[in-house]
Amino acid sequence: MTAPRRLRKELSDLQGNALKSFRDIKADDDNLLRWTGLIVPDNPPYNKGAFRIEINFPAEYPFKPPKINFKTRIYHPNIDEKGQVCLPIISTENWKPATRTDQVVQALVDLINDPEPEHPLRAELAEEFLKDRKKFVKNAEDYTKKHSEKRPAD
């Protein structure tokens, strides 16, 4: 299956699945290789907001992994200030062409709901998460209230 055919199918499948944690999924009108969507986490401290992401697929997809970037700022040890994500499923060494976008999105939602401080992009947040969870949760909640997008109504 060619990249455009596979991407159209995956986009259609994702849009039809009505995932509560990934909404408003669309491809760029001029570029099927660029998608946007809204991550809607279930767990505190992120469950008071929603986070816009962009998924960029390489022309060689599915043989090369997509890249995910957060467009909404988030206080999270695995996502840096530029919105880059440390997500093992899409690392070059772990990527498998059979991996579908819905699996990638689910791994991302799981990471948001359950940070992995042992693989941080922001060491200071990982340290705070490990040493003072209460402070981390308060900071993340405040940051989410200030910077996140409004959650869609169910």
UniProtKB/Swiss-Prot annotation:
Annotated catalysed reactions: S-ubiquitinyl-[E1 ubiquitin-activating enzyme]-L-cysteine + [E2 ubiquitin-conjugating enzyme]-L-cysteine = [E1 ubiquitin-activating enzyme]-L-cysteine + S-ubiquitinyl-[E2 ubiquitin-conjugating enzyme]-L-cysteine
One Pfam family named in its UniProt record: UQ_con
Stored PROSITE patterns: UBC_1 (PS00183), UBC_2 (PS50127)
Active site annotation, chain numbering: 86 (glycyl thioester intermediate)
Any one GO cellular component localisation term in the record: nucleus
Keyword tags: ATP-binding, Ligase, Nucleotide-binding, Transferase, Ubl conjugation pathway
SMART domains documented for this protein: UBCc
A GO MF term: ubiquitin conjugating enzyme activity
Gene designation per UniProt: Ubc10
Name of this protein: Ubiquitin-conjugating enzyme E2-18 kDa
Function: Ubiquitin-conjugating enzyme E2 that acts with the RBR family ligases LUBEL, ari-1 and possibly parkin. Accepts ubiquitin from the E1 complex and catalyzes its covalent attachment to other proteins. Appears to be involved in the selective degradation of short-lived and abnormal proteins. Functions with ari-1 to control the subcellular localization and morphology of muscle nuclei (myonuclei) by regulating the protein levels and distribution of the LINC (LInker of Nucleoskeleton and Cytoskeleton) complex.
Entry similarity comment: Belongs to the ubiquitin-conjugating enzyme family.
Domain of life: Eukaryota
Organism, as annotated: Drosophila melanogaster (Fruit fly)
Lineage: Eukaryota, Metazoa, Ecdysozoa, Arthropoda, Hexapoda
Subunit structure: Interacts with the E3 ubiquitin ligase ari-1 (via RING-type 1 zinc finger).
